A protein has these predicted regions:
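Glycine/small-residue-rich loop that forms an oxyanion/phosphate-binding "nest" at active or ligand-binding sites
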Residues: 81
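N-terminal pre-ligand scaffold of iron-sulfur
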Residues: 1-58, 71-72, 76, 84-102
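Short cysteine clusters
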Residues: 44, 63-66
Length: 102
């Protein structure tokens, strides 16, 4: 799939917050970092914790299950690049956050 799909209304995701949404059948975590939106696969690669329900601190999110922390702009684990979460392209049009899966 190469098209962008609606994930969330931008107004519903204030800065410093995350949302867990389903986009094209996949769980996606969407983040607002200072007004810029980012999207990662919604499950932590460690044990499958819900990243969209994690603790957001600037450009980082910590998994609520075991505190693994990822950079939402790159998907990289801050402790080392051996664990990475897939990152998705994001754009905002007409107040809607759109995510491209694929």
């Amino acid at each position: 799939m190469s098209d962008y799909v609606l994930a969330v209304a931008a107004a519903d995701l204030p800065p410093g917050q995350a949302a867990e949404v389903t986009v094209a059948g996949q769980v996606v975590a969407v983040f607002n970092v200072g007004g810029t939106f980012h999207a990662l696969a919604g499950r932590c690669p460690h044990r499958g914790g819900p990243l969209g329900q994690g603790f957001v601190d600037g450009p980082q999110v910590s998994c609520p299950w075991h505190n693994w922390t990822f950079d939402v702009t790159t998907g990289e684990n801050v402790a080392g690049p051996d664990m990475k979460v897939p990152r998705y392209e994001v754009k905002v049009e007409d107040g809607q956050v759109l995510v491209r899966i694929g």
